């Protein structure tokens, strides 16, 4: 992941851009490469599909009950709820989303342009991120809306659009009370394409290093991308007094508790480090596992297709059919009248006979084939007329 962070920015050598400030230096050194952002967005979109794949193929398939089925049915709802808590924690703590943080990405507020330019010019700006460039509450809410709420609403609207489209295909009646559905079919795809085009234009501006935003909402609310930097605290004065008191402390319960708390504070940092190492590995293993299972399923399907292509054995024939097959010219003669077939039809057993002969024979012989003597499924007995009837036992041939 750190490979992309070490790539030189294409806009660092450009001068006189719209983001330029003092001495011709702009905000280009702050922006990451487009590869980092696209990789992060791709993983963010693949993560729910991968988790649902594991849930459906292992938990639901091995333990099918009403709880696991409901868990799979309402997957998008509870997954978005959990993701919302995780994303809000990371936005509040790190000014970054869960996936972006593992790619070394961070969001900052570009409303104070002079402070951002000072951060580029000041060599010490690489050490910590000032409070004025951190996201405010409104900008964090916008990112939460873009990452959590809007994808959920879009997914539900896509489902409604698909249902309405399918209903219009299979139902031809159009009444006046369906005008909201017709308006939705016209307006929603147009708005969706318009937003996609707007996001594409913002990405083109990002490629030209005119902005650090990659979406329309980020561009409107002055939210831009940068690489991860430590955030400065509002109470930075406490850092100067920390560690100055080297006097002996009293060994009472409070001091012992404070000492243990200080020693245990390393656990969250350790868990964060392990998570940063485990998450990329988990994503890689998950993709390999999906590829492996897909290849295995493809092999099984190909094997089944090959088994179907094998020669199908002929069905067993009765002694009467064997005698009939030995007769000369049986393939061109009707098995009932033993003459040349006129007005041909085919029976369920695959043999051809004259249509009048076949009807007469089947009715008088309780629906049995004249060649194999097998009962035809298309011949039924009518209890009202006390006669056998040919329903679907034969088919006319057009020659």
From Swiss-Prot:
GO MF terms held by the record: protein transmembrane transporter activity; ubiquitin ligase activator activity; ubiquitin protein ligase activity; ubiquitin-protein transferase activity; zinc ion binding
Gene Ontology cellular component annotations, sorted alphabetically:
peroxisomal importomer complex; peroxisomal membrane; transmembrane transporter complex; ubiquitin ligase complex
Q: Does the keyword Transmembrane apply?
A: yes
Miscellaneous notes: Present with 907 molecules/cell in log phase SD medium.
Self-association state and partner proteins as the record states = Component of the PEX2-PEX10-PEX12 retrotranslocation channel, composed of PEX2, PEX10 and PEX12.
Q: What are the entry keywords?
A: Membrane, Metal-binding, Peroxisome, Protein transport, Transmembrane, Transmembrane helix, Transport, Ubl conjugation pathway, Zinc, Zinc-finger
Peroxisomal matrix side of membrane: 1-33, 93-136, 209-277
List positions binding Zn(2+).
Answer: 334, 337, 354, 357
Residues passing through the membrane, by range? 34-62, 68-92, 137-168, 172-208, 278-305
Q: Which residues lie on this side of the membrane: Cytoplasmic?
A: 63-67, 169-171, 306-399
Please, one GO biological process term?
A: protein import into peroxisome matrix, substrate release
Membrane association type: Multi-pass membrane protein
Which residue intervals are annotated with compositional bias (Low complexity) in the record? 9-24
Q: What is known of its domains?
A: The three subunits of the retrotranslocation channel (PEX2, PEX10 and PEX12) coassemble in the membrane into a channel with an open 10 Angstrom pore. The RING-type zinc-fingers that catalyze PEX5 receptor ubiquitination are positioned above the pore on the cytosolic side of the complex. The RING-type zinc-finger is degenerated and only coordinates one zinc ions, preventing E3 ubiquitin-protein ligase activity.
Protein name in the entry: Peroxisome assembly protein 12
ZnF endpoints (RING-type)? 334-373
Coiled-coil positions: none
Top-rank taxon: Eukaryota
Its encoding gene is what?
PEX12
Q: Which InterPro entries match?
A: PEX12, Pex_N, Znf_RING/FYVE/PHD
Give the UniProt family note: Belongs to the pex2/pex10/pex12 family.
Compartments, record wording: Peroxisome membrane
